[in-house]
Amino acid sequence: MTLPDFRLIRLLPLASLVLTACTLPGHEGPGKSPDSPQWRQHQQEVRHLNQYQTRGAFAYISDDQKVYARFFWQQTGQDRYRLLLTNPLGSTELELNAQPGNVQLVDNKGQRYTADDAEEMIGKLTGMPIPLNSLRQWILGLPGDATDYKLDDQYRLSEVNYRQDGKNWKVVYGGYDSKTQPAMPANMELSDGSQRIKLKMDNWIVK
């Protein structure tokens, strides 16, 4: 099916709320070495998670468009996950269901699309070049394929720099939710030039 010129609703009334909620505080204390055993242990604990879910605020900001929404992210197994974006009234703007070899997306008109690559599909449908394949690792506080990254004073990821498809993504973590074990990111910002993606996680459920 030919992909339309689809755009999420610009939820501008949420702008101040989301931008305030996603403001990243400065890091305190010196960073730790990526070779430290504490960091290796933290990575191992996160990678052992089979199922998890989180919800919160999403913002995409560029010179061409601004998108604000609520999001729900759920992983039910290896390479099986669901991403939901909703407006303030709770109506679905986008629902993505992915499993190995098959990705399905439903837009706010109920139109269904299928593809092999979730990242490419979202980019074409929404105009937002979200690095979804890498974000699946970054949202957990893991560097993924990136080798240029820094840790905070608690041996957790604080910054990632990664070049992908001609884009230079910088990921900055503003804090972690220590109520979960292991601690999971509480908010983060991705940037590439004038593009910014902000995520604020309200809570995590991990298994």
From Swiss-Prot:
Location relative to the cell: Cell outer membrane
Carries keyword Phosphoprotein? no
The entry's protein name is: Outer-membrane lipoprotein LolB
Organism encoding this protein:
Salmonella schwarzengrund (strain CVM19633)
Q: Where is the signal peptide?
A: 1-21
User: Which membrane topology describes this protein?
Assistant: Lipid-anchor
Give the lineage: Bacteria, Pseudomonadati, Pseudomonadota, Gammaproteobacteria, Enterobacterales
Domain of life according to the entry: Bacteria
Which SUPFAM superfamilies does the record cross-reference, listed alphabetically? Prokaryotic lipoproteins and lipoprotein localization factors (SSF89392)
What family does this belong to? Belongs to the LolB family.
